[in-house]
């Protein structure tokens, strides 16, 4: 499948097309009010070397595949739907993390309030010490609210 078929005509503030998830939507997951942040969908644009899918693929693609994911898009969808912790990042970013005690599958997101979404800037598989000293915004390992538009499929890597 040509990669252009994985994008919608909707674009980010830089004109970069949003990537579609496995259900054909530009919304990969959601941050809800219960998470102590402004509620909005999580989206990722094709981007370039500074942000988005292209940035993650160039910097962390091999590492992501080495950790059981077939594609970077699969990794982004998995973390967006399954994060169990949110940490304060640098400046105005947040880290969405799926923790397992060995490493954290992490997405760096930033709120674009006027456009109404959380934008994936970067991501990768990091040592658990990476975010240890960052401020925790949300922990939902036992009380995660249901994710809108989820069909209950487990997107864990095989």
Language-model segments: what does each one mean?
Residues 1-158:
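Ribonuclease/tRNase effector modules and their secretory precursors
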């Amino acid at each position: 499948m040509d990669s252009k078929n994985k994008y919608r005509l909707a674009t980010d503030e830089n004109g970069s097309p949003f990537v579609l998830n496995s259900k054909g939507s530009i919304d990969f997951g959601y941050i809800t009010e219960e998470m102590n942040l402004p509620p909005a969908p999580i989206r990722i644009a094709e981007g370039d070397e500074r942000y988005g899918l292209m940035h993650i693929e160039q910097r962390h693609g091999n590492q992501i595949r080495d950790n059981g994911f077939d594609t970077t898009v699969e990794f982004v969808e998995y973390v967006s739907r399954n994060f169990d912790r949110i940490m304060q990042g640098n400046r105005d970013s947040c880290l969405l993390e799926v923790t397992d005690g060995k490493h954290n599958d992490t997405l760096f997101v930033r709120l674009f309030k006027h456009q109404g979404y959380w934008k994936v800037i970067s991501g990768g598989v990091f040592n658990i010490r990476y975010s240890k000293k960052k401020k925790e915004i949300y922990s939902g390992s036992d009380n995660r609210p249901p994710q809108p538009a989820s069909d209950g499929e487990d997107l864990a890597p095989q």
